[in-house]
A protein has these predicted regions:
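Conserved N-terminal alpha-helix of the aminotransferase class I/II PLP-enzyme fold
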Residues: 35-87, 109-117
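Well-ordered beta-strand positions enriched in small/hydrophobic/aromatic, beta-favoring residues
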Residues: 147, 215-217, 314, 340, ...
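PLP-dependent enzyme catalytic core of the Aspartate aminotransferase-like
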Residues: 1, 115, 124, 142, ...
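Short hydrophobic/aromatic beta-strand micro-patches
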Residues: 218, 341-343, 403-405
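Conserved PLP-enzyme active-site core in the AAT-like
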Residues: 7-16, 76-307
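N-terminal "arm"/small-domain region of PLP-dependent enzymes with the aminotransferase-like
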Residues: 1-57, 65-66
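Conserved small-domain helix->loop->beta segment predominantly found in fold-type I
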Residues: 268-271, 275-277, 282, 286, ...
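Active-site beta-loop-alpha junctions enriched in small/polar residues
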Residues: 152, 181-183, 319, 345, ...
Length: 425
């Protein structure tokens, strides 16, 4: 099936008892066992079925199936937020004393987690230039466990060469983990380009309406955990925390996503609610249609800003003079999603005046909403970073980030024009 069809039909046929055409909301904590042996078999992971909604739920399972198939993976794990997905994706692979490699240009929450929280857990994060995959080898040692990047960075709006990163990571025996939130699987599937694990903040474009927090981890199913000395203890030996299961022996290609479910999710509990899963399924159904308008509007906004005398610079990867245009054309079909950034003449003060003058664009820190959104990253999403960290993350004091929605383009341009005029005063 094509991606547009997967988003509507994968993982569900009408429910056998009620014949419900819509995916039901299974608002339950627990599931009955046929008998004692059935319960034991479920806990041993010997049979398929549901145990407890902290670990799995039938509504959430449909969402997981659809997201996995959209990204071209073999399975997915949906959790309570995008940050929970990032946390669990990393924790599935690391322990105290390990290190990971990550690009410098990351979402502010991710950068803060990597730079400050992981080190307190005994995990070192080695930051590299997102344009230099060769730095992976120079930062790899025997305790390195993964390489992490964003396909399209937020808010730097840089584009990473995923095939080059994958090739270099694999040469070191490392999996490549890619946050694909900004691109979405509608525009780009990292797994098809060599990535092993994909992260989605379902809160953003997939949910699409600013109503629901959620995240997902997608397993590409291609990385060789078996026989890899970096992951001997993690996947190839009995796990005393879960009935002595050997993940590679028991789950084969799905060893990674199985461990993510029964170790970090089971033990720390950032479970997605069934009702949230239902709302995210509604958003997913129209993802392809919305992304067409997001991309169309964002390009027109970028072109408008590029010509405006009050604007110092514009960063949108689909612009002809963007340093990322070649990658967007090669890997994304020429479309660069709905996120862009720009700088206003007058710096931070003018940027604040611009933000305050907006009448249609909403002043908030989410992205991927059907409505257009604006924020000043240096004082919001990246406020916790000092000046040096801001520079490393690619966030300048004058940067304004726009998440361009699906409204009529004439209304969006009119709002931007009047706000830019107000910024001159």
């Amino acid at each position: 099936m094509k991606r547009e069809t997967i988003a509507l039909h994968a993982g569900y046929q009408s429910e056998p008892t009620t014949k419900s055409a819509a995916v039901p909301i299974y608002q339950t904590t627990s599931y009955t066992f046929d008998n004692t042996q059935h319960g034991a078999d479920l806990f041993n992971l010997d049979v398929a079925g549901n145990i407890y909604t902290r670990i799995m739920n039938p509504t959430t399972a449909v969402l997981e199936e659809r997201v996995a198939r959209l990204e071209g993976g073999i399975a997915a794990l949906a959790v309570a937020s995008g940050m929970a997905a990032i946390t669990y994706a990393v924790q599935t692979l690391v322990e105290a004393g390990d290190n990971i490699i990550a690009t410098k240009t990351l979402y502010g929450g991710t950068y803060n987690f990597f730079a400050h929280s992981l080190p307190r857990q005994g995990i070192e994060v080695r930051f590299i230039d997102p344009a230099k995959p060769e730095e992976i080898a120079a930062n790899t040692d025997s305790r390195t466990k993964l390489v992490y990047c964003e396909s399209i960075g937020n808010p730097a709006i840089n584009v990473v060469d995923i095939p080059a990163f994958a090739q270099t990571a694999h040469a070191q025996g490392l999996p490549l983990m890619v946050d694909n939130t900004v691109a979405t699987p509608t525009l780009f599937r990292p797994i098809e380009h060599g990535a092993d694990i994909v992260i989605q903040s379902l809160t953003k474009y997939i949910g699409g309406h600013g109503t629901t927090i959620g995240g997902a981890i997608i397993d590409g199913g291609k990385f060789q955990w078996a026989g890899n000395p970096r992951f001997e203890k993690t996947f190839n030996q009995p796990d005393p925390s879960y009935h002595g299961v050997n993940y590679c022996e028991h789950f084969g290609a799905a060893a990674y996503i199985a461990r993510a479910r029964v170790v970090p999710l089971r033990n720390t509990g950032a479970a997605l609610s069934p009702h949230s899963a239902f709302l995210l399924l509604q958003g997913l159904e129209t993802l392809a249609l919305r992304m067409e308008r997001h991309c169309e509007n964002a390009l027109k906004v970028a072109e408008f800003l590029k010509k405006h005398p009050q604007v110092e610079w514009v960063n949108y990867p689909a612009l002809p003079d963007s340093p990322y245009k070649a990658l967007i054309d090669r890997d994304y079909g020429g479309k660069a999603s709905g996120l862009l950034s720009f700088g206003i003449k007058g710096g931070r003060e003018a940027g604040a005046k611009f933000i305050d003058a907006l009448q249609l664009f909403l002043r908030l820190v989410n992205i991927g909403d059907a409505k257009s959104l604006a924020t000043h990253p240096a004082t919001t999403t990246h406020r916790q970073l000092d000046d040096a960290e801001l520079a490393v993350a690619g966030v300048s004091p004058d940067m304004v980030r726009l998440s361009v929605g699906i409204e009529h383009i004439d209304d969006l341009l009119a709002d931007l024009a009047q706000a830019l005029d107000a910024a001159k005063a």
